[in-house]
Amino acid sequence: DDTEKARKAVEKVKEGGTLLKGKIKTATLLKAVLNKEWGLRTGKIISDVFVFEDRREKEPKLVLMSDGGVNIRPDVNTLVAIINNAVEVAHQLGIETPKVALLAAVETINPDTEETINAGIISKMNQRKQITGCIIDGPLALDNAISEFAVQKKGITSPVAGKADILIVPDIAAGNIFGKALTYYANYPVGHVLVGTKAPVIISSRADKSDVKLNCIALSIKNSKN
């Protein structure tokens, strides 16, 4: 059955190579990958890092987004790990000091909205050098994170607003929807890879086209520390 196939695939990839999901359900494969006895855990939080080519300007740029694949509704500690994983990938892609936007519906902290509170905490942690290797700001609405026009119109002062390299979503639903919107509406080149595992793991959608799977493979190779 699929559960046994997933276990065998996990055991096999420990010998070398990359684990690429085929027609098996994502939940089934992730359960094997995350198994505490024989899975691919390293002790780090595992997260999915999505990379796309932003083509809105004359010169396209790579932008990362996380986590739309593993962590359902991360708390502050998990969000910090997700950020560190994404920053690690950004460094591998040549982005020396990535600008990280913590996304929410608004750019102000609302005591009734958990994601804005978490964003405020994490932004302060970055200012106090508790999170390094990047510049973090949030909460930021999506337009404020990626559009300098929106930033100017709203009068926002931020080292990240309008030029984010990494977008951190508050939960898996937001990330999954955002990723699929880029793929199906914008038709942007995309790819993604799991970070925090003993071996590279690619959780591609069963509906992904061959070019997306190729991008995922290239990304996993680039992010490999072998």
In which residue ranges do the predicted regions lie?
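Anion-binding alpha/beta catalytic cores of soluble intermediary-metabolism enzymes, centered on
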Residues: 1-160, 164-226
